[in-house]
């Protein structure tokens, strides 16, 4: 009888003790597995590539994409089963444009849910910001600090949505600045007045990191129009 009572007591302790939620932790040198559906839009895949580079820069870690599970789980609400499987409440994203939710699950996974494709992309690059990567890392030579460990509390949650619908950059007075730098230095071209696709892609990358969605390209008479420049249309589609 005494043994039965002790056994029952231990069972009670096991049942009564709460399950402790885990922090989200990445360590230097590990392979970071990211769960993301291959059906996600191109801008989401572009943001994933950028995050992969940022993780390599900050943690000296490689990334690997998996369709089912990972330390980071990414998806667009209503389009990705990965998000619905996590069981996290994404109702706060309903009716919002280009919004995202970052949340650490009880298992210690970082969940990134977007209300639409750009919301998901912005959420992915919020991880880069949390890692310490500035949106201006390339244009202003802001080298991020190396880390051995990156951790988010088990209670971490961040819901963000834009307060202004259209946010972007207008390229002005390119005659003496961007255009000659692009055509003579960054991507030398024999085409007069050309701001090449590599230059524009760097601008698009900055826009995505800044969560901008509008681009007014250079329009002075000395500059070749945006859509007449080879590769610009294809570059824009990635972002």
Language model feature labels by segment:
Residues 7-16:
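Bacterial N-terminal signal peptides
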């Amino acid at each position: 009888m005494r043994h039965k009572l002790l056994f029952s007591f231990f069972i009670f302790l096991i049942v009564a003790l709460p399950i402790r939620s885990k922090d989200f932790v990445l360590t230097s040198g590990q392979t970071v597995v990211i769960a993301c559906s291959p059906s996600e839009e191109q801008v989401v895949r572009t943001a994933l590539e950028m995050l992969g580079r940022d993780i390599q820069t900050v943690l000296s870690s490689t990334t690997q994409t998996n369709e089912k599970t990972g330390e980071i789980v990414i998806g667009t609400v209503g389009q990705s089963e990965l998000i619905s499987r996590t069981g996290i409440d994404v109702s706060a994203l309903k009716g919002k444009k280009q919004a995202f939710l970052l949340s650490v699950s009880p298992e210690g996974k970082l969940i990134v849910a977007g209300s639409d494709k750009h919301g998901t992309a912005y959420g992915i690059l919020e991880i880069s910001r949390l890692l310490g990567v500035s949106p201006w890392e390339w244009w202003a030579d802001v080298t991020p600090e190396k880390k051995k460990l990156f951790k988010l509390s088990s209670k971490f949650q961040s819901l963000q949505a834009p307060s202004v619908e259209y946010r972007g950059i207008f390229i002005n007075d390119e005659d003496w600045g961007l255009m000659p730098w692009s055509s003579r230095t960054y991507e030398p071209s024999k085409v007069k007045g050309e701001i090449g696709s590599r230059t524009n892609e760097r601008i698009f990358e900055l826009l995505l990191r800044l969560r901008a969605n509008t681009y007014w390209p250079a329009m002075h008479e000395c500059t070749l129009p945006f859509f007449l420049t080879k590769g610009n249309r294809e570059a824009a589609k990635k972002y």
